[in-house]
């Protein structure tokens, strides 16, 4: 067996080299397809003269590193996607007016070329407003400083900048020969984004803006169709598309346009202090199947991969650093099972139906019951002969239904769709999950080879490996710290001062307290109070550099008691943003910091109007300005050794060095011991962190897939920290001595920070004899030639570790009537005694395996006349460790 594993490893390396060469060649040649045109009719997009049913995977390139892109694209294709969809992020590409950035995570051309080299198409959503839970909705903050500007309306300054950027992107794609008519992957573009949600706020100017945006886009000569999503008044030559949890009832505003679903929300975003969203795979598959059943032709998962809001890119306010979104690929690019696998099966079933779906101009409708219906597609196939496909739906949320269709009986589980690619046999039902379930395991770091000498730096306690026992600390100054401050009479709006170069803005004023004030307070009780009509997101109030208190909220009234001493006192206000507003009308007016009046109450002679006081302003932190989080500049700061018994302190910088974990599994920092702040590794900004507990109530004990989904249904993680693990991409790590720097705002213990790896360590499969046959069997020559009946094919359990991993052990296997679910299986009354040995022989030491669910596979029938199920629980381990295992 060890020899076979070594052979497998060699074969895998050779295969990887071949794949790399195949990918690299078209990138060099600049051509990915034979040039083709894209048009559309009422039924579908027409690609190279043929109607297509398309599945799209939403991937935002800046939410991953370039080193991750190829794997994400490959897994999307493996999962059945035809298209990748992404926004274009204006504030990432033009952070300073006229200065463009197309490097690193913003190397858009490279991302598009990788998509083309994989054989997938691209839907490029230029916007340039994107929403996307992205900082300021993708708009660069400098845009709001242009005199007279109003965003997203018939406003000349805005239209000028928008046209300039959209033209820049279209020209960039054309110059790189990335449009389909040039042999590239781009088949469709988008202008604006969900403008219909806010259009009424702008009146007639909004309607005029829609017409202008469409005309401007079409005038660029991109040569592919343009769409507008959630735009019922989209002009005739722009396709209006649907966004939402369900779009099977959507109809475009013209009979000449196809039904497109640009955002299928397969999960939801998360706010600090919120629970985690979860959309069941069964409901998501139901929504997609219903969409194609009722005439849809293009559907995109928002998101297929969510990724990470690195740096300060998260929008909000208060959106967390993780953008996992409960997507089919998780934040790190690992498959989320069973969602990824169940959707892969769904896509395969839809592809089997595609000849019939494109042959018919519209489906034939047939009522099967009070809440049951069929849609039948039939016509002439491209290669001759008749084609037929049918979708049987049961929209009853509670009861299964037995229906008759074409003379045959079918059982439809509640809230499900059965897909019949030949109008006779069921290839897939949305409520019957045959895909494996994966359980993500988070493991303490194993030092990489060659780094064993630093093991003494790792502290072990309660089976936790902490990142380091050696930390340095540096106190961030409270208040004005540099010469680049300025003084102004009155309170200024936060963004007008910071230009979003930092989350933080210091305000300082001098408060004079008389002896009479002191006597007045002694006689009348409490001291003075800072009162501000409205503030966002975080306000901290200091008196003479001592923290008086803090307030968190979104445009909430701020009232903070303060205590002064007699004489002159420094009143310091620190405002802080936690992601700029990314959704809504009039974004340019939203701003940050304070609104309304600010006053200081409780003085003997009355309130003090702080709005008219003289204030000194300082943007950002001294540590930020000195770039002490970078490898180049951190040694210039005056760090001191942090004692292990040091008390938590506010406004502290911490640094240490660590070696990366061995292997290729995704790396995370566990920051549960910290309070709130920001983190950097080797100068790369990991993002904001915040150890805030979600509400205790609101999570369902059980998640029922049946019935319409919303973001509050099936949530998880109630009563726990919203986020504790923060992704550190492997490409940002060096072989040893990686610099970790944190800025801690509220107080935490860096000695309990740990570095961990995440992988799909546990796989489970549970499939019964009544399950449908594997989708791949429909494409075998025996079935196509008619020498095999699909009904004679047994279902299978399919187990598949992540790349670079193999099945190291079978923890449980039972063919019969097993009880329980993944990580909790037990043997039932009926059990084939050879289950464990049969499954182990088929799977152990392999990256993936198939086990037939049949008496034949297990040699005999353990309980005649009983419907049997195969349940398996296995573990995956890195393949390089397999040589240490005995078989």
UniProtKB/Swiss-Prot annotation:
Xref: Pfam families: BetaGal_gal-bd, GHD, Glyco_hydro_35, SUEL_Lectin
GO BP term (any one): carbohydrate metabolic process
Highest taxon, organism lineage: Eukaryota
Tissues where this protein is expressed: Ubiquitous, with higher expression levels in siliques.
Glycosylation: residue positions: 37, 463, 485, 496, 527, 785, 881
One MF term in the entry's GO annotations: carbohydrate binding
UniProt-annotated location(s): Secreted, Extracellular space, Apoplast
EC number(s) recorded for this UniProt protein: 3.2.1.23
Keyword Metal-binding (UniProt): no
Catalytic center residues: 194 (proton donor), 263 (nucleophile)
Main localization, broad class: secreted
Residue span(s) of domain SUEL-type lectin: 791-877
PANTHER family: BETA-GALACTOSIDASE RELATED (PTHR23421)
Family: Belongs to the glycosyl hydrolase 35 family.
Protein name per the record: Beta-galactosidase 9
Provenance organism: Arabidopsis thaliana (Mouse-ear cress)
Taxon lineage: Eukaryota, Viridiplantae, Streptophyta, Embryophyta, Tracheophyta
Name of the gene: BGAL9
């Amino acid at each position: 067996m060890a020899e076979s594993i070594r052979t497998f490893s060699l074969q895998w390396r050779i295969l990887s080299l071949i794949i790399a060469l195949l990918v690299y060649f078209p990138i060099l040649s600049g051509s990915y397809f034979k040039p083709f045109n894209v048009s559309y009719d009422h039924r579908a997009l027409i690609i190279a003269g043929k109607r297509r049913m398309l599945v799209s995977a939403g991937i935002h390139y800046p939410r991953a590193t370039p080193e991750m892109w190829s794997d994400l694209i490959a897994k999307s294709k493996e999962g059945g996607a035809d298209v990748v969809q992404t926004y274009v992020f204006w504030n990432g590409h033009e952070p300073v007016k006229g200065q463009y950035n197309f490097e690193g995570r913003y190397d858009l051309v490279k991302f598009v070329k990788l998509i083309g080299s994989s054989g997938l198409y691209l839907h490029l959503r230029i916007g340039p407003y994107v929403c996307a839970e992205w900082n300021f909705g993708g708009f660069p903050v400098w845009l709001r400083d242009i005199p007279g500007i109003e965003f997203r309306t018939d406003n000349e300054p805005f239209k000028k900048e928008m046209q300039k950027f959209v033209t820049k992107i279209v020209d960039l794609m054309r110059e790189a020969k990335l449009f389909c008519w040039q042999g590239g992957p781009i088949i469709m573009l988008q202008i604006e984004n969900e403008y219909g949600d806010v259009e009424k706020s702008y009146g007639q100017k909004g309607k005029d803006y829609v017409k202008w945006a469409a005309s401007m886009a079409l005038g660029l000569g991109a040569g592919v169709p343009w769409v507008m999503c959630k735009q019922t008044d989209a002009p005739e030559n722009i396709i209006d598309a649907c966004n939402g949890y369900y779009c099977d009832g959507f109809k475009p505003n013209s009979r000449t346009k196809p039904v497109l679903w640009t955002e299928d929300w397969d999960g939801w975003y998360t706010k600090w202090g919120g629970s985690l969203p979860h959309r069941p795979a069964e409901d998501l598959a139901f929504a997609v199947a219903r969409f194609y059943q009722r005439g849809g032709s293009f559907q995109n998962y928002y998101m297929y991969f969510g990724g990470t809001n690195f740096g300060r890119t998260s929008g909000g306010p208060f959106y967390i650093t993780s953008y996992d979104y409960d997507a089919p690929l998780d934040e790190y690019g690992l498959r989320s099972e069973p969602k990824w696998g169940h959707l892969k099966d769904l896509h395969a079933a839809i592809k089997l139906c595609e000849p019939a779906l494109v042959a018919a101009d519209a489906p034939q409708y047939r009522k099967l019951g009070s809440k049951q219906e069929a849609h039948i597609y039939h016509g002439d196939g491209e290669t001759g002969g008749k084609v037929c496909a049918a979708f049987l739906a049961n929209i009853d949320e509670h009861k299964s239904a037995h229906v008759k269709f074409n003379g045959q009986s079918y059982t439809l589980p509640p809230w499900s769709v059965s897909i019949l690619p030949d109008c006779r046999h069921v290839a897939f039902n949305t409520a019957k999950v045959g895909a494996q379930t994966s359980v993500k395991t988070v493991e303490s770091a194993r030092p990489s080879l060659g780094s064993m000498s630093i093991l003494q730096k790792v502290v072990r306690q309660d089976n936790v490996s902490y990142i380091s026992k050696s930390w340095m600390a540096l106190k961030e100054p409270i208040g004005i710290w540099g010469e680049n401050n300025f003084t102004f009479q009155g309170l200024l709006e936060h963004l007008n001062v910071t230009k979003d170069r930092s989350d933080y803005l210091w305000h300082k004023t001098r408060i004079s307290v008389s002896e009479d004030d002191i006597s007045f307070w002694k006689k009348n009780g409490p001291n003075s109070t800072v009162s501000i009509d409205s503030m966002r997101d975080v306000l901290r109030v200091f008196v003479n550099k001592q923290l008086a208190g803090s307030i968190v909220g979104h445009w909430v009234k701020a009232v903070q008691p303060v205590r002064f001493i007699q004489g002159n006192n420094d009143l310091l206000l620190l405002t802080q943003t936690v992601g700029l507003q990314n959704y809504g009308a009039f974004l340019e007016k939203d701003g940050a910091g304070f609104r309304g009046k600010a006053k200081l109450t409780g003085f003997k002679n009355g309130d003090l109007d702080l709005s008219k006081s003289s204030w000194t302003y300082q943007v950002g932190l001294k540590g930020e300005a000195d770039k002490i989080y970078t490898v180049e500049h951190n040694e210039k700061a005056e760090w001191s050794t942090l004692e292990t018994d040091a008390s938590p302190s506010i406004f502290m910088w911490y640094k240490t060095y660590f070696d990366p974990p061995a292997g290729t599994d995704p790396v995370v920092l566990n920051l549960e011991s910290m309070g709130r702040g920001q983190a950097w590794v080797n100068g790369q900004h990991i993002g904001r962190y915040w150890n805030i507990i979600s509400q205790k109530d609101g999570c369902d004990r059980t998640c029922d897939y049946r019935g319409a989904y919303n973001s509050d249904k099936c949530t998880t993680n109630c009563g726990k920290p919203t986020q504790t693990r923060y992704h550190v991409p492997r490409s940002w790590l060096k072989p040893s001595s990686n610099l970790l720097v944190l800025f801690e705002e509220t107080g935490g213990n860096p000695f309990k920070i740990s570095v961990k790896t995440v992988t799909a360590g546990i796989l489970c499969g549970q499939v019964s004899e009544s399950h449908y046959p594997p989708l791949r069997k429909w494409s075998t020559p025996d079935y196509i030639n008619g020498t095999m009946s699909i009904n004679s094919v047994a279902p299978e359990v399919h187990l598949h570790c992540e790349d670079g991993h193999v099945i190291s052990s079978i923890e449980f296997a039972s063919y019969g009537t097993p009880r329980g679910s993944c990580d909790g299986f037990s043997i039932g009354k009926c059990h084939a005694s050879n289950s464990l040995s049969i499954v182990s022989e088929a799977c152990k030491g392999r990256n993936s395996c198939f086990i037939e669910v049949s008496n034949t596979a297990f040699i005999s029938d353990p309980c005649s006349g009983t419907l049997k199920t195969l349940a398996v629980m296995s573990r995956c381990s890195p393949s390089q460790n397999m040589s240490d295992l005995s078989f």
